[in-house]
Every structure is written in structure tokens, then in C-alpha cells.
């Protein structure tokens, strides 16, 4: 039986592999955690700690309230654009970003808003096309790596999936980017990195993908897909395994070191 590395390498050689990049990759170069975003919104909106600390006060709900109060998400996007950015030098020093570029995935999806992936490709002189909305899909060139900003991009406020309504709209999975994802994913090996698997949108996406294959009657022909996790998790291994996803667990206490070791 082929190892995980051999299966991914074979799919890469055939240009039939895609990478899905989560927040853990951005945090590896110093991007702040979601708690900082929550604190900023609470301070801007004049909310006390008790309100913000309530179990049902999610960052998505706060962003929705922010949009209602300010009329748009624009000011918050501008703040995030400043705070959710790191120097190109930090990206250049990132072993994880260097490895992602060198692995040469033809298609990369990310739920991160920042420009770190794009910066890494520019630093190493690798051409790419960024896709954040329906208009960008027309730019697709089969010879260039595609970086699909699945939850939007700071260059386009309307593309951001940030507030609660944005997430609910995304749950229908019928936007142009969702249609593209299904088309890209059905015939390819997928590797998910940088995810804690706590994002219900991603979990629902994985479930929908499994359901599509199951209902097709050709589930046995589905390409292998993998989820990298920094350490073992028997619950996730069982649940994701039910959906046809293979969990690959790292063995380093440091999540970033664990991911870098896996990618290398």
C-alpha cells in the first residue's frame, strides 16, 4: 500500500491534487488570533466584557452587529487589512510558505483573508492567478497556480465571508466559488492543512463532498483526501474517516514545526 506521501506525490505529478490552507498557516508567521478581532470590534462598538463573553456572542455575530451599526464592513476590513498583514521578510523566512510554493499544487484554496500566500509566490518568482469572486474565475489559466480566496479577500469588501449573514449565505453552497470548488474537488486528491476542524462551514463542505460521492453510486472511485492535524485526535479521525477523509497526525508539540515536518 502506498504511503500518504506517495499518494500525494503521485497526484501532484499528474496535476490532480489541490491544497486547502487554513488559519494555522497564517498564524505561523505571526498573524493575530481571532480573539484580537473580537476585542477590536467590542471596543469599537462600546460593548462590555460580559456581553462579549456570552457563549452565543460569536465573532460572526459581532461582525454582523458591526455592519448594522456602521452601515458596512468597510472600516473593519480596513483595520483587518492593517493588522492582518506581516512583512514580506517574515513570509520569506517561513519554512511552511516556502514548502507550499515548492510543492507546486496547481490549485490552492484558502479561507484566510491575508495576502501571505500571494506574497510567498511572488517572493519565489512563481506566477499565479488569484480568484476571490466570479469575475476572477474568467482569469483562470491552466498553466498558472490558482489561489482561490474561498472566504474573500481584503481587496474586495463584498467578497469577504466574515459576518453571520455571509456564513449563512455560504451554507447554501451555490455561489460561483462553491460551484468551482465542487468541480475542482470531485476529481482531485485534497490536502487540508492549518485547520482545527472547528469551522462548521468547512466541516459542512467536507460532508457535502462526501455526500455527493455517496449519492453518485461511485464512492469507491473517489480520490483520496487527507487532513493534516498537529497531533492525534481519535474523535476527528473517526468522524472525518466516516466522510472518506484520512487524518494524518503530526508528532511535534509545536503545531508549526509539526506541519513543516510533514510538508517537507
Functional labels for PLM-detected ranges:
Residues 19, 27, 31-84, 127, ...:
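A phosphate-binding glycine/aspartate-rich beta-alpha loop in the early core of alpha/beta enzymes
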Residues 157-177:
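A short, charged helix-loop
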Residues 1-19, 25-29, 40, 44, ...:
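SIR2/sirtuin-family catalytic core signature
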Residues 149-154, 164, 229:
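Short, structured patches in soluble enzyme cores that scaffold and shape functional sites
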Residues 11, 71-139, 161, 169:
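Active-site periphery "cap/insert" segments of enzyme catalytic domains
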Residues 61, 89, 225-227:
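Glycine-centered structural positions embedded in regular secondary structure
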